[in-house]
């Protein structure tokens, strides 16, 4: 696939992707992906990457951020999208995805630490431990996290939250 990229001018690749209005082609090759800032696809890139559990693509996005790639000059990767899919990734226990979203700037404390609450509610103990290590507050919103963990029968989670300072009487 690497050779295919160089067989056509960039302008033609941009036209092909714009015509199909899908980013799937851009995910087949790192060189293709870097064209994302040139196309007019109306798709939420982070949504697609997270919903398909493409942690390698997120890793590449982090690499692009580290070199100040033009992909970050346009609103292709937005804080709103990062925060939204951080919450969803916590809900489904996608810890590798969560790590990359945080590196990209997702806010674990957004909306009263809802991300850690979703992880507690769904029993993802390793996720909760990671979020706490990154500064998530398990006591906000009247100890929402322990309330959700206990109401869903995640007793090991409840024990961990108590050890971390959650208030069972709240």
Curated annotation (Swiss-Prot):
SMART domains: ANK. InterPro entries: Ankyrin_rpt, Ankyrin_rpt-contain_sf. Keywords: ANK repeat, Repeat. Gene3D superfamilies: Ankyrin repeat-containing domain. It holds the Pfam family Ank_2. ANK repeats lie at residues 41-69, 81-110, 111-140, 142-170. This is Putative ankyrin repeat protein R846. It comes from Acanthamoeba polyphaga mimivirus (APMV).
């Amino acid at each position: 696939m690497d050779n295919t990229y160089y067989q056509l001018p960039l302008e033609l690749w941009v036209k092909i992707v714009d015509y199909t209005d899908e980013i799937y082609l851009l995910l087949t090759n790192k060189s293709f992906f870097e064209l994302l800032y040139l196309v007019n696809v109306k798709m939420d890139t982070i949504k697609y990457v997270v919903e398909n559990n493409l942690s390698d693509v997120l890793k590449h996005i982090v690499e692009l951020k580290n070199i100040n790639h033009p992909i970050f000059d346009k609103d292709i990767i937005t804080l709103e999208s990062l925060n939204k899919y951080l919450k969803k990734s916590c809900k489904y226990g996608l810890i590798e995805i969560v790590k990359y979203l945080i590196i990209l700037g997702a806010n674990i404390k957004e909306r009263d630490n809802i991300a850690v609450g979703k992880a507690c509610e769904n029993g993802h103990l390793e996720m909760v431990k990671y979020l706490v290590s990154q500064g998530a507050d398990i006591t906000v919103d009247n100890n929402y996290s322990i309330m959700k963990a206990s109401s869903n029968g995640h007793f090991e989670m409840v024990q961990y939250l108590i050890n971390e300072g959650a208030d069972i009487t709240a």
